[in-house]
Amino acid sequence: KRARNTLISLARAKGIDAQGTDMLIGTAGRFEWKNKGIDVFLEAMRRLGEKAKGKKQVVAFVMIPYLDREDFTMGNVHVVFVPTYLNGNDGVLNLPYYDLLIGLDLTVFPSYYEPWGYTPLESMAFHVPTITTSLSGYGVWCEEQGCTTIDKGVAVIYRNDSNTNDVINHIVNTIEYYLSLTPRKVAAARKAAVELALKAEWKNFFAYYREAYSIALKKASARL
C-alpha cells in the first residue's frame, strides 16, 4: 500500500488527479531508446489515450535514469517520467525500485533486443503481470512454458524488424483487455505471474548450467 500511495502522490504532485482506483503501469531499465522498447512504450501510451477516452484513468511511470522528458497526457492516460536511480535516496520517492514495483498493476517491457530480461521476470515475481516480446530470452522461455497471454501473468508479443506498429497496437489491446478484467480474474493473473516466475529460480536452472559447463570442459579437454 505504501508503494501505491507513493506513486499516486507523485502523480498528484505533477498535477494529475490520481485516485487509488486508477490503473498504474510502469516500465523501467537502462536508457536504451530502441533496445528497451522505450519508443514503443511511449507510442503505445499515446494510442491507448486516444482509444480509451472516457474509460478508467491510467497513470504510466517511466522509471528510467537520465530519460528526462516532459510528462504528457492523452485522454485518460498520463505519462510520468522518473529520470533517476531508484535506490531509496532520490529525494522524491525515496523508495528502492523493488519497493515501488509492488505498487503497480501492470508492467510493459517491449524489448527489441534482450538476451534474457530480468525486469519482466522480477515484475512477475512481485505479483505484477507483465508484457514483453519474443525478442527477449525471457519471453522465449515463457512461450516454451505455454504462457503468452496476460491471463497467465505474461503477454509475449511477437516482434521483428518490421512489425513495430503491430507491436504497439498489441500492447494497447492487451492493456485494454486487462482493464476489462474482473477483480477475480486480475487476482488469478497475478497468481499465475508469480507461479511462472518461481519456475525461473536459479535452483531450477542450475542443472542446465552444470550440463553446459560439463560440455565446455569436455570440448576444452579435447583440444589439449
Segments the model singles out, each with a brief description of its role:
Residues 1-224:
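Catalytic cores of carbohydrate-active enzymes across secretory and cytosolic contexts
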